[in-house]
Regions:
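GNAT-family acyltransferases
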Residues: 1-106, 168-169, 173-186
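Conserved catalytic-core motifs of GNAT/GCN5-like acyltransferases
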Residues: 22, 133-136, 153-173
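Amphipathic alpha-helical recognition patches that constitute DNA-binding helices
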Residues: 29, 97, 114, 131, ...
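Non-catalytic cap/lid and distal C-terminal segments of serine-dependent acyl enzymes
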Residues: 72, 82, 113, 132, ...
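Conserved acetyl-CoA-binding loop-helix of GNAT-fold acetyltransferases
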Residues: 102, 108-123, 144-149
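Glycine-centered helix-boundary capping/hinge motifs
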Residues: 108-110, 128, 151, 166
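Short glycine/proline-centered loop/turn elements that form peptide/ligand docking sites
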Residues: 112, 116, 139-143, 160-165
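Conserved GNAT acetyl-CoA-binding A-motif
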Residues: 125-135
Length: 186
C-alpha cells in the first residue's frame, strides 16, 4: 500500500450479505437506527445526530478516498442491516482501522462476521494492507466473539475508557495481520 488515497469503494458480495458503497441513497435506512439507544451504547456514541448531520456525513463518505464505507445489505430480502467502515488510513504502514455498527435486529445472525470477513478479504487482497485494527468495549462480548471468528486477536486493553450507566468500560484492542490465519469467503 503506497498510495495515500484508496480506490473508489467496491461492492463486495458474500453468501448472504452484499456490501454496497455507503452514500446519500442510504439516508432513510441509516436515519431509522442512527440514534437507537442500544446501538449508541455498543459503539460508545454520545451524540444525538440531526437529519442534516446524517445527510452531510453520507454525502462526504461517498466521495472520500481515505476510507471505505459500506452499507450491509441482506442479499435475500434487500434489507439494510448496518454499516461497516475501513478508516484511519496509514499508507506508510499499510494499516487501517475497521468499525461496524449493525442495525437493531441484525446481531446474532452471522451478518457482522460475514461482512467483516468480506472487508478483510478486500483489505488484504485488493488494498494490500498489512494490518487492520479495531477496539471494542469489554461488555460487548458478542462482538468480540464475532471478531475472533473473523481472525482478530486481542492485542491489549485500555482501562476505563468509556463511562457507562453502571461505571466504567474498558476498550479491548484487537487486530489481524495479512498473514494471520483467518476464514475467507473468496
Amino acid at each position: 500500500m503506497q498510495a495515500q488515497r484508496l480506490p473508489p469503494t467496491a461492492r463486495l458480495t458474500g453468501p448472504t450479505v452484499r456490501l454496497d458503497p455507503l452514500g446519500p441513497q442510504h439516508f432513510d435506512d441509516t436515519w431509522a437506527w442512527v440514534n437507537d439507544p442500544e446501538s449508541a451504547r455498543l459503539t460508545g456514541t454520545t451524540t444525538i445526530f440531526t437529519a442534516e448531520q446524517v445527510r452531510t456525513h453520507l454525502a462526504a463518505v461517498a466521495s472520500a478516498r481515505d476510507r471505505s464505507d459500506w452499507a450491509i445489505v441482506d442479499r435475500t430480502s434487500g434489507t439494510y442491516r448496518g454499516e461497516i467502515v475501513l478508516n484511519d488510513l496509514d499508507a506508510t504502514n499499510a494499516s487501517m482501522n475497521v468499525r461496524i455498527a449493525l442495525a437493531p435486529g441484525a446481531p446474532g445472525r452471522g451478518i457482522g462476521t460475514e461482512a467483516m470477513t468480506l472487508v478483510l478479504d478486500h483489505a488484504f487482497a485488493d488494498l494490500r494492507l498489512h494490518r487492520v485494527a479495531l477496539d471494542v468495549f469489554d461488555f460487548n462480548v458478542r462482538a468480540q466473539r464475532s471478531y475472533r471468528k473473523a481472525g482478530f486477536v486481542v492485542e491489549g486493553r485500555c482501562r476505563q475508557t468509556f463511562r457507562t450507566a453502571d461505571g466504567w468500560a474498558d476498550s479491548i484492542l484487537m487486530a489481524v495481520l495479512a498473514d494471520d490465519p483467518r476464514p475467507t469467503l473468496r
